[in-house]
Amino acid sequence: MFTINAEVRKEQGKGASRRLRAANKFPAIIYGGKEAPLAIELDHDKVMNIQAKAEFYSEVLTIVVDGKEIKVKAQDVQRHPYKPKLQHIDFVRA
């Protein structure tokens, strides 16, 4: 099982997402269940290494946000058209 550390996003929108990507991070969202959707930011290099394994897409992952563990599955992964970069990931609560 994989564990990913995340932070709650302070800003949202196109400009904020671009600033995140310039800082070697990228936006993601956790939704599903009875809780409200949670916008988070992830470290690009750490997630890039983890997502290279097939288990990332099939197993339940643990995302730690502010010390709270959330069990999720990867729902959708958006990649840059020609660079080896992640743009955004949707996670659904497991």
Swiss-Prot record:
As one GO molecular function, the record gives: 5S rRNA binding
**Gene3D superfamilies referenced in this protein's UniProt entry, alphabetically:** Ribosomal Protein L25, Chain P
InterPro entries attached here? Answer: Rbsml_bL25/Gln-tRNA_synth_N, Ribosomal_bL25/Gln-tRNA_synth, Ribosomal_bL25_short, Ribosomal_L25_dom, Ribosomal_uL5_bac-type
Top-level taxon of origin: Bacteria
Mind listing the UniProt keywords for this protein, alphabetically? Answer: Ribonucleoprotein, Ribosomal protein, RNA-binding, rRNA-binding
A Pfam short name: Ribosomal_L25p
Q: Which GO terms describe its biological process?
A: translation
GO cellular component terms? Answer: cytosolic large ribosomal subunit
Q: What assembly does the database describe for this protein?
A: Part of the 50S ribosomal subunit; part of the 5S rRNA/L5/L18/L25 subcomplex. Contacts the 5S rRNA. Binds to the 5S rRNA independently of L5 and L18.
Described by its record, this protein's role is as follows:
This is one of the proteins that binds to the 5S RNA in the ribosome where it forms part of the central protuberance.
Family listed: Belongs to the bacterial ribosomal protein bL25 family.
The name under which this protein is listed is: Large ribosomal subunit protein bL25
